[in-house]
A protein has these predicted regions:
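Radical SAM/AdoMet-radical enzyme domain recognition
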Residues: 2-14, 23-38, 112-215
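Catalytic-loop Lys-Pro-X-Asn motif of eukaryotic-like protein kinases
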Residues: 17
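Radical SAM enzyme core and accessory elements
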Residues: 280-356
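Radical SAM enzyme [4Fe-4S]-AdoMet core and its adjacent flexible, acidic
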Residues: 155, 163-273, 277, 311
């Protein structure tokens, strides 16, 4: 599956879902992924976040479908178990050349390796095992690490995670990742009113002190107990206001396909980002789909149905058939989500079942 997605132009892979570092063989998995070389698309935005190659979203482009990245669920094993990220336009324009079957040659696995730049590989983790694994992952070919945490105060962190001493382990992991060259390390914090909005400024201070990029994420209706309500969301404007009272921010230009709005502190020390799918949806520039750990493609976090890729694989579908299926699914990607609207229907899976 990795070879197929790379042949379609995928340039980025993120391993996520549960805790990837618990998976046996994750270092070797990264090593194998690092051997692939993206095919078929030239970047139109050469300097995206952290210097990574970006493909500018172009839903109005006559070229139509343009794949960019993969978010890889960690629950499946082997290179046929990767999730994909792809971007498409609504108007079913003709496929770009890279998607035409006659231009997708059935090449040996080795022929798509060792040419050009490698895939941009990242992992999202809770960080508890990162201290010991950062250097092996870097040596295997990993480029970046994102750590998920909802508090930067040690006592609060322990109450949330129920892991005594956990904050020190995670902090050591982030520092090890930074020292290994897996940076800038990103920290994702989901904000929920009445739970951890008092951590906004402490996280900003943490970004400055530790040299990490903190990204605040608006709380979305994807939780198991369905407690989401508009009042639980801490919106982008409030985050900026609270942070601005601590220290002025300057917005940083970013690629349109980036999910986060990026800001630097006025003295140049420290960066934060805000991912605001509720108050400022970015559906029009979304460049991602996922494959869940049970082999289902989801074109949006809030999809009310899945597309069963695993069933095709189980029944012996050829590479061309799998590629055509993926393309067809992406062409059906939702225009937007409907969070907060009267006709909003909750996603068919909660976040824990989607994977990170």
């Amino acid at each position: 599956m990795a070879r197929i997605l790379v042949s379609l132009g995928i340039t980025k892979v993120r391993i996520t879902g549960g805790e990837p570092l618990l998976r046996k063989g994750v270092v070797e998995f990264v090593r194998e992924l690092a051997k692939f070389r993206p095919q078929g698309l030239k970047p139109e935005f050469p300097n995206g976040a952290n210097g990574a190659t970006e493909v500018v979203p172009s839903r109005s482009s006559p070229q139509g479908l343009k794949p960019q990245s993969i978010d890889a669920a960690s629950g499946m094993s082997g290179s046929r178990a990767l999730p994909g990220g792809a971007e498409e336009q609504r108007q079913r324009a003709p496929r770009p050349k890279a998607f035409d079957r006659e231009d997708r040659q059935e090449q040996p696995l080795s022929s798509q390796r060792d040419r050009g730049l490698p895939l941009d590989l990242a992992i999202t983790t809770n960080g508890h095992l990162l201290a010991d694994m950062a250097q092996p992952l870097k040596d295997a070919g990993l480029n970046r690490v994102t750590v998920s945490m909802d508090a930067v105060d040690s006592d609060r962190f322990t109450r949330i995670t129920r892991v005594p001493g956990g904050f020190d382990h995670v902090l050591a992991g982030m520092r090890a990742a930074r020292d290994a060259g897996l940076g800038p390390v990103k920290v994702n914090c989901v904000l929920m009113r009445g739970f951890n909005e008092d951590q906004i400024v402490p996280f900003g201070m943490f970004a400055r002190d530790e040299g990490v990029v903190v990204r605040y994420i608006e709380f979305m209706p994807l939780e198991e107990d369905r407690v989401w309500a508009p009042s639980t969301v801490v919106p982008l404007e409030e985050i900026l206001q609270r942070m601005g009272e601590y220290r002025p921010l300057v917005e940083i230009p970013h690629a349109r396909s980036e999910t986060a709005r990026r800001y630097r502190f006025d003295d140049g020390i420290g960066e934060i980002g805000i991912i605001a799918p509720v108050s400022h949806p970015f559906c029009g520039h979304c460049s991602r789909i996922r494959i869940t750990s049970d082999g289902k493609i989801r074109t949006c976090l809030f999809s009310v149905w899945d597309h069963d890729l695993h069933a095709l694989m189980r029944h012996g579908a050829s590479d061309d058939e799998l590629a055509d299926f993926i393309i067809g699914v992406v062409q059906k990607k939702e225009e937007r989500h409907h969070i907060g609207e009267p006709d909003f229907v909750p996603a068919s899976r909660t976040m824990v079942h989607i994977g990170g």
